[in-house]
Amino acid sequence: MSTHDNADRQSEFVADAVTAMKLEQSENNTDAPILNGGGAAMKPDSKAASPEPLIKDERASSTFMKSRSSSRTPSSRTPLKKEHSDSEDIQEKRGDDASGTEKVGGGISVKMEPGQPPKLARSSSQKVVPRPPQLFLDLPDSTEEAQKTFEVIETCQYANKYMGYTEHAMECDCAEEWVLVVVLAPSPSFRVPSQNPASSTNRACGEDSDCINRATKIECMGDCGCGPDCQNQRFQRREYANVAVIKTEKKGYGLRAEEDLRPHQFIFEYVGEVINEGPFHRRMRQYDAEGIKHFYFMSLSKGEFVDATKKGNLGRFCNHSCNPNCYVDKWVVGEKLRMGIFAERHIQAGEELVFNYNVDRYGADPQPCYCGEPNCTGFIGGKTQTERATKLSNATIEALGIEDADGWDTAVAKRPRKKKMGEEDEEYVDSVQPKSLDESGVTKVMAALMQCKEKWIAVKLLGRIQRCDDERVRNRVVKMHGYQILNSQLAMWKDDFNVVLQILDILDKFPRLTRNKIIDSKIESTIQPLTSCGDERVEQKATVLLQLWSTLEIGYRIPRMKRDPNAATPTVSQFHRRDDISDERQQRPRSRSRSRSIEAPRGPAAQKRGGQGPRNQHHQGPRTFRRRFDPLPQGWFAAESNGRTYYYSARGDTTWTRPTKPAPQPPPPPKESRDKALQSIIDGIMNAKEQTPKEKSGTPTTPQPSKPTPEGKDRQEKWRSYSEEKQKKLYENTLYPHIKYVVDKFKHKLPKDDLKRYAKDVAKKLVNSDFKNNRVTDPTKIDDKQQKKVKKFCKEFFDKAVAKHQAHEKRKAEKLAKEGSSDNKLATPVGGQSEGDGTPDVKMSDDEGSTGREGTGSLKRKRDELSVGNTNTPDDTPTSSTKRQRSSTPPPPPPPAMNTNDNNNDNDDMSVRSDEPDADADADEVVLVGNPTPPPPPPPPPQEDMRIPDADAETNGHNFEGYGEMNRSHQAQIGIEGNV
């Protein structure tokens, strides 16, 4: 072939040279492992063998072989060929001539430009061909066998306490989100939520929640606002997936999913020994010398590695794949950075769990890859992998905003030209235009920035935030712990003033409302040293920013309740819930207008049964709702007299005509009794303040010289002007702490009500005895000797009370044992009364209140009746439970009381205070005052109707008496505490 002919076919010669180089390399490296997805094409006897990635043009190959045979000795190698149709050759030739490029194979083409040497370029990214997942259900479970090859540990073991350290976890702003389990009814159109609290689930900080901690890959810690059922504590609770260890054909042990896994589900934590860079290199050489084939090093952060070679858990058996179904992610748990394996897609039960080692896993020498995926790179680990492959995770690539994230990993891994260590990723990112930051991408950027240890990645991420001008995006950055994350980045790169200026510019653009987030992040203490760092631009920017922040106000936030971690979770019972509802109904004022009742679910429509109507003859359909027509104006009430309705007001006005305007309010009640009660309470409080020493203030005050105050002496001697009853009350208050000291020791031996009554009795007895024998010199204080006597007397008194109580309980038990054989006697006592007390049996209904809900006055009068005749020694008769009778036909509701404020105090505290000894005696007086008066007599009958039927008078009169009785029974429960 002439030289001129070779010159005319220069473009073909370049393509053939590259093709021959690939063929020669594949033939010479016969000992190299067969690459998955590509090496199979080099087998001549394989039906699937296709020389398409290697030779694209048969004529070019033949031309090149002829030129080589004329200049060199003939080679015994037989070139691989591929048959093409003439139409395909013509189309490819035309395409190459038009574009100036020639396709070589594997997506690589030769680009020809005038005056420039030929360049190799990748025309398109190699997409992974989807294929059905391979299942390994037939392999046996080898978990126990595999666990014998290493030491199983639960958590990472750190070489020192500073290893794996990261910024402290931030508090979560989420609240509890309880979701009830829905039970399907027989009808598909009706759903009833479960009323059992045990069937509800707390979905707080779950996958579908807007939890800031979960979005930024931070686990909630300890006292979380979500409660003990927080869904964002997977590492701490070791919520591992159900997996098993299997023994593969070429890859050794592997992990198999025993159940279906959803995307992003936590599978296992990668644990081991956390070491720094020095021990990492030593162990690599040591394991290589020991003949350990598999390596288990994972990069935790810059200069820190997790070694699971000899210590770890089942996560170490997760193999490598170039097309993985799992990924490795790093989470902040407390003050440590931890690594976990997560599902990247939906994984079927029986699939092998694999992830890409090129991101964080390292080994001494390159090893052949047996993943069998179409996009397999051929090797795992070693220097070649470290130089050629990208070391960035998919999350970091997405956070950087690179458009072609799918093709980047393959393009960098297959790059023919070598790059310097650590520079190829940065150069590639610089060559790609990142996307603009939107509101949905803030989460990925802040999560990557939280764990970023590389300066160039931090600069790229900060640049995306800095270039954004959308106010909603900035608000989202602040919400995603923006101040805390930027504070950590500022402390990390404070020596680089360019990065510091970048962060300060972002902080200056943040919305400024309150100082709360600024104070919580403690970023001011980090910026303060920058005001004198030496760089004029940084100093000016930091000073202005601190001045702007100092003008902001601190917004008040309700502090979060601190939970006791040792406290048991309260269990809710449906019976307690019913009692609480009845309590609420009793406390709630009754409305005069009827409210619409809740309609129960109706059955199938009548048309579905051919118009026959309901099968049940008792089912008459829903009752029609009748709302009360035109209620009375405020302040007016209705009553009946001889079958006629008249209207009256609280002031005493009566009329037969229905009023249309609100009634004038009555004059306020006399204040004498109220003022007297208030004054007694005020005096008791003032006396208690005089006797209680003031606590030391937390804020130190300037000491002032003490001056003699004559008023202090007069105030101390003021008790001499009190009456004897008032002095006794003061002395009783003085004895109260010492009596209570003894009472507390007997609170588990005696009933609560008896204990209170005994304490009051012993206090009365001590006060009367000391005043009778003139042992009281100052009722506001007692000496140590008197204190010991009081405690000794109280102890003897309560010892006797306990002995009598135990004897009474013993007799009661013996009596019940004797009468146990006769059930009829227990069911119907002789005379219709119970054995324990003389009160008749009363039937209780579900809506009746218990003893604890009765009024204060009723309980106190009952207590006085039980304690009559024995005030110095404990009573042997047990207190019976107070019950209300339920009438068969309840009377109509009464008119409201004259004083509406009295009804609000029905449920006041029932506790007996030692500073109010005469509360029981005063209760009856107040109850008598609070009894409502019956309605005023009706006005004169109208002129048009002077006759009133006599038959209706008796009936209406009976109903009218029912109003008074009902109102009196309601008002009788008001005690002195409620009126005050």
UniProtKB/Swiss-Prot annotation:
InterPro entries: AWS_dom (IPR006560), Post-SET_dom (IPR003616), Set2_fungi (IPR025788), SET2_Histone-Lys_MeTrsfase (IPR050777), SET_dom (IPR001214), SET_dom_sf (IPR046341), SETD2/Set2_SET (IPR044437), SRI (IPR013257). Residues 630-661 form the WW domain. Residues 80-97, 576-587, 710-724, 772-787, 811-822 have a biased composition (Basic and acidic residues). Disulfide bonds: none annotated. Its EC number is 2.1.1.359. Residues 365-381 form the Post-SET domain. It comes from Emericella nidulans (strain FGSC A4 / ATCC 38163 / CBS 112.46 / NRRL 194 / M139). The lineage of its organism: Eukaryota, Fungi, Dikarya, Ascomycota, Pezizomycotina. GO terms for molecular function: histone H3K36 methyltransferase activity; histone H3K36 trimethyltransferase activity. Histone methyltransferase that trimethylates histone H3 'Lys-36' forming H3K36me3. Involved in transcription elongation as well as in transcription repression. This is Histone-lysine N-methyltransferase, H3 lysine-36 specific. It is an enzyme of class 2 (transferase). PROSITE patterns: AWS, POST_SET, SAM_MT43_SET2_1, SET, WW_DOMAIN_1, WW_DOMAIN_2. Residues 61-78, 870-882 have a biased composition (Low complexity). Residues 167-239 form the AWS domain. Belongs to the class V-like SAM-binding methyltransferase superfamily. Histone-lysine methyltransferase family. SET2 subfamily. Pfam families: AWS (PF17907), Med26 (PF08711), SET (PF00856), SRI (PF08236). Residues 616-626 have a biased composition (Basic residues).
